[in-house]
């Protein structure tokens, strides 16, 4: 991604989820220092509408999706971006909407 000069953006909800899992003040500050170098993007009205559509489409197909995953997917779609993730739930979500995933290069 960096090699291809793609902008890196972190959704605000991902920043929150990441820092919520930190157990010490020192680790929290260290994580915040690392993440502060990235642009943080916040969901807007259109992102929330798209997330609702994604959840609805998932549920119609019998797929369980969290609201947080749906908002992350929606923000990525609305930015015409690619999502870098190791969470398999997004692979499932990408099959029912226009979510593009970043493909890791094989070694």
Question: Language-model features: where?
Answer:
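A generic structural signal for well-ordered alpha-helical segments
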Residues: 1-2, 33-34, 58, 76, ...
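PIN/NYN-family metal-dependent endoribonuclease catalytic core
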Residues: 1-24, 41-43
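A generic structural signal for alpha->beta connector loops
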Residues: 5-7, 37, 80, 98
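Positions that flank functional sites
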Residues: 16, 50, 73, 91-92, ...
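Active-site neighborhoods of divalent-metal-dependent phosphate/nucleic-acid chemistry enzymes
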Residues: 39-86
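Acidic, PIN/NYN-like endoribonuclease modules and their adjacent C-terminal/linker elements
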Residues: 78-107
């Amino acid at each position: 991604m960096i090699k291809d000069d793609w902008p890196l953006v972190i959704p605000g909800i991902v920043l929150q989820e990441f820092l919520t899992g930190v157990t010490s003040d020192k680790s929290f500050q260290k994580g915040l220092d690392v993440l502060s170098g990235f642009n943080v993007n916040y969901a807007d009205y259109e992102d929330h509408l798209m997330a609702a559509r994604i959840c609805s489409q998932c549920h119609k197909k019998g797929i369980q999706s969290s609201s947080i995953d749906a908002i992350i997917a929606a923000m990525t779609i609305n930015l015409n971006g690619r999502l870098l993730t190791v969470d398999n739930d997004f692979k499932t979500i990408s099959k029912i909407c226009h979510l593009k995933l970043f493909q890791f290069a094989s070694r």
